[in-house]
Every structure is written in C-alpha cells, then in structure tokens.
Amino acid sequence: VFTLNGFPYGGFHRQVVKDQVYAPDWSLKTRLRYTLRLTSILAELLPDEMEGSISTLPLSYKPWFQENQPIRANVFYKASIYIARVVAKMVRIRTETGKLLHLDLEPEPDGLIENAAEVVNYFKAHLLPIGGAYLAKYLEIPLAAATAFLLEHVRVCYDTCHFAVEYEDPISVFKQFEAAGIKVGKIQISA
C-alpha cells in the first residue's frame, strides 16, 4: 500500500453526500486526529522503497463561508496549523524510518481551494507563513527548514476531472505549481 484516500472521513457511505463529504473539515481537530492516524497506518504499510501519499480535502467547503470572511480566515489559519502538525509527524517518521510521506490537497469545485491559483495563494498566504512559523517553533528549527519540510510533505492531488471542470490547462497548472515550488504528489485520472 502506497496511497490512502483521506478525503472522506471514516466509513463514508451515505445516500446523499453533497457538502457532508467535507466534514469534518481542516478547521477541526477531528480531521487532524483522523489524518494523524492515517499517517501512522500508511507508515506501517508502506514498502521501504516507495513514497506514500494521503489525499485530503481542499481544507473545507467554500459555500459554508461565502458570507463570513472572519470565519473563512480562521479556517485557513487553523488548517495551516493542523497541516503543519501532520507534517511534523511525517518528518519524524522520515527521520526514524527513512519513509517519505506526503499529504496531498485535492482541489475541486466548491472546495475552499478550487483551482491552481487558489492552491498557490493558499501556500503563499497561509500554509508557508502560518504553518511554517508553527512548524519552526514546534520542531525548534529555522523557518527556512520548516518551509522546506512543508513543501516536501504537502503536495497536490491533481484530479483530471476537477481541474477540467475549472477549465484549467494541465500544462499551465503544472507550470504554476512548479514556479511556486509546489509538488504534485498524486494524479487521479477520472472523468
């Protein structure tokens, strides 16, 4: 096993999915704890010679916060801290076992991160400054090292259907990510 789908929470088999697939979102400790458990499981199952990926939701569901910018800003803040905590665990696992794990954000329509521009903006405006400062303090390392860890362990799950629905050219998307130092950790071919 080299990849896990951490987007849906637990055993998700409801008749009507809609926005509930985003619950719990990255503003809640429940999502953090769930992802930390997935990280431990993948570290055990992952063959030594492979990288491991866990796909996850694009932070939250955008329509929940359309009219409330302060709450939306808080979601970006908490998500960045919680994702940095997952990265801290992934760094520890790599130090102890040599296994490289990464968390792959999966942008999609109506997600808090929908497209390439929003991915780049999230990394530049939230994850790297907020998550980087947290990770630097938590691991007692320089900010530059924390930033490098975030860029190594937080990537994008590129779903062909989701980006097609956003009318984004794949070459342009990959160039935007590369220019921002953001890696693609997983590609999902879907229609």
Language model features by range: what are they?
Residues V1-L4, T35, V119, D159, ...:
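Conserved, mostly hydrophobic/aromatic
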Residues E106, C157, I187-S190:
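Generic beta-strand/beta-sheet core signal
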Residues N5-G11, S60:
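Short glycine-enriched loops at secondary-structure junctions
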Residues V1, V86-K89, Q176:
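Catalytic-core regions built around general acid/base machinery
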Residues V1-G6, G52-T56:
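Short, well-structured secondary-structure segments
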Residues Q15-R155, V165:
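Active-site acidic/histidine proton-transfer and metal-coordination neighborhood
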